Amino acid sequence: MTPEAALRVGAAFASRFALPAKAAVCASGEPISVVLKYAALAGIASQGVDAEAVNAASMSAFSYTVRKTGCAGGIYVNNNGRNAELVLFDENGIELSPDAMRSVRAGFLFGEQKPTLDAELGIIGNLNGLEEAYEQRLLCGIRRELMLNNKRTLRIGAPEQSGRVISRVLLRLGWNVERSYAENGLSPVFDENTIAVQIDNDGKISLSISGDTILGNSEVQTVIARSLAVNCGGGAFGLPEKEGGAELLVVPVSLPEPYRDDIKKQGVQLIYSKESLAEQRRLSFARNAYYPALYEPEAAVVKLCEMFVSGELKDYAEALPKVYTSEKSIRTAWKDIGRMLRMLAEGEKNGELVDGLRLKRDTGWVCVRPAGTADASFRIVAGSRDSEYAKELCDVYVEKLTRLRDSEKDKNS
């Protein structure tokens, strides 16, 4: 991403707004992200839209800023360790939908519409202090007395801005916070007063408690969702930001079947979303069931710390059913992906077409979805409470997809 490209993205993004309007821009804090931030600000102002520069903050804090300050949208410049990227938000602080992104992309290719008068330019200002407001919101959503009277240690590995938000919130409660820079993920925790958490660049969370108990992202989502379900309609982090969504929880379609059943036993209806956190946030807002602890990594970690103190986390982790998964991938031509997925769906019953195809099979389940990577076209993930059955189920669907791929080759030969 070059500054010129960032300027054009900012202009294309702002050209969609009805004037008068304002949009916010924030960077994750690295030097290159700051350069791109000011380029995007210039692009927004070039279209007559007022541009607000926000100090370095986490993506969740910036999303909260856009939502609470009347902005028509926002741009977050994120340096994920590989390449800088621009994440575009709507007026609700939710990542733009694919339809809106196509509109921005068309504007980017067309080029910015330059004004004829200086008076038509937007004003660039500063919008600060919202990160502190976001931290206060996290503090207001937990049982402070419980946290203050039961001080613990959090060992955390996370993107810089997310780690700072979480650290400041917990330090106010008297907790010890240790930053972890381990490249190989979590290590076991043998101190009963310590919890270790890892947040990756996609917002997925894993945690370690009490010896070799390590929970992956699906397990973390399940224990949080179960806690929300038990306290539905009240309690810390139990209420959605918009009233009326107390009976619904939006979870990824990849959530294993036993975990789904565990949550539904609490009397909550589950709505299934695509895998990405952005899609989960978008659907939860649309269904009026936005729970910060499920869709914001910072809120999730604070919630997990509260559950750790109350004993809920250990109880829920021990009660989780044991799940085994097996994963494989196959390659095929890009033009055949849609055809193969459609043919597979037509030959199966009771499939869920969300983010690919999900099927229930006896005591197991299988997800088949486009991989979206250069070295694989399809990703097949099978699961069961029996490890051998999970492997067998995965092999069965790899074979089915292979036959579909080869049958098309035979027709063309």
Please annotate each region the language model reported.
Residues 7-14, 41, 45, 63, ...:
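Predominant activation on well-ordered alpha-helical scaffold segments within soluble catalytic domains
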Residues 201-202, 211, 222-413:
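Phosphate-binding and adjacent anionic-ligand microenvironments
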Residues 21-29, 152-158, 247-253:
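Short glycine-rich phosphate-binding loop at a beta-alpha junction
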Residues 8-11, 15, 19-86, 168-213:
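N-terminal small/polar loop signature for handling phosphorylated ligands or for N-terminal nucleophile
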Residues 2-11, 83-193, 237-240:
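Gly/Ser/Thr-enriched, mixed-charge loops and adjacent short helices
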Residues 90, 94-110, 214-231, 271-274:
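Short, acidic/small-residue loops that bind anionic groups at enzyme active sites
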Residues 4-8, 20, 31, 35, ...:
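Conserved active-site and cofactor/substrate-binding residues in soluble primary-metabolism enzymes
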